[in-house]
């Protein structure tokens, strides 16, 4: 974990209520896709945990949804705004277990970390397939970003207004993939858990207090005892999850 000051370089709307923010700052503490950052906001007691969408030397990209006063405040930030951010939080995804053809499944706010994961897998010569889930076409974001990487991308919408009608599990194939990586709301993760036929890693979205394991506010039960989503997670192995 590392604390630093970051400067907003861009902040654009991707879809209604969904924004992409690029920041300049020290990203050396970020070591794996699936980690998150914790952002301090003026007038707010708790920091806001946001997953890492992408990072490079001196550059951090986050994609966030406006769900309350804090993220609404973020959506109005102009380039040049300075933010106090904790980076390198959480365990992230383990790429060594993926096999050659992993399947990446993201739903809503769980889509951004799939992008950094896809880039890292491609850099290792692996060929991921991607499923992105939305409620309706108007909410779609980042499909073009994944396609620009040369990936096979399937979009699902609950109302059928774009892509496959239904949920992400309606697009999960019976065979042809070696491993599953997923991130999204708990009901989606449970459905993927039940539908997928391989091992995998599941990233959980939980409300957090401190973001680094001190407050014990995001503890969950696993087959191997209690784990803190912010510290030992947010990524858990499929085999250890208790529903």
Where are these regions (language model features)?
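Ferredoxin-reductase
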Residues: 2-81
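Structural signal for conserved beta-strand scaffold positions within catalytic alpha/beta enzyme cores
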Residues: 10, 54, 155-157, 202-204, ...
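Short, Lys/Arg- and Gly-enriched loop/turn segments at beta-strand edges
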Residues: 45-52, 90-97, 230
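FNR/FR-type flavoprotein reductase catalytic core
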Residues: 69-207
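Local cysteine-cluster metal-coordination motifs and their immediate loop/turn environment
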Residues: 113, 205-234
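Short microdomains enriched in Cys/His and/or Lys/Arg
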Residues: 234-243
């Amino acid at each position: 974990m590392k604390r630093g000051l970051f400067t907003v370089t861009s902040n654009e709307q991707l879809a209604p209520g969904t924004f992409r923010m690029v920041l300049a700052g020290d990203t050396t503490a970020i070591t794996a896709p699936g980690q998150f950052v914790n952002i301090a906001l003026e007038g707010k007691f708790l920091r806001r945990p946001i997953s890492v969408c992408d990072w490079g030397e001196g550059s951090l990209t986050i994609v966030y949804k406006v769900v309350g006063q804090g993220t609404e405040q973020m959506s109005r930030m102009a380039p040049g705004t300075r933010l106090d951010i904790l980076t390198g939080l959480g365990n992230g995804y383990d790429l060594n277990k993926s096999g050659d053809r992993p399947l990446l499944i993201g739903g809503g706010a769980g889509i951004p970390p799939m992008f950094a994961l896809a880039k890292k897998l491609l850099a290792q010569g692996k060929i991921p397939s991607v499923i992105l889930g939305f409620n309706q076409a108007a909410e779609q974001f980042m499909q073009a970003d994944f396609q620009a990487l040369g990936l096979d991308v399937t979009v699902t919408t609950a109302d059928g207004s774009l892509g496959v009608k239904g949920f992400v599990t309606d697009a999960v194939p019976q065979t042809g993939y070696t491993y599953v990586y997923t991130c999204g709301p708990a009901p989606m993760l449970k459905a993927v858990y039940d539908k997928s036929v391989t091992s995998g890693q599941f990233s959980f979205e939980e409300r957090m207090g401190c973001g680094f394991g001190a407050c014990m506010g995001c503890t969950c039960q696993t087959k191997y005892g209690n784990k803190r989503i912010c510290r030992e997670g947010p990524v858990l192995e499929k085999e250890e999850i208790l529903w």
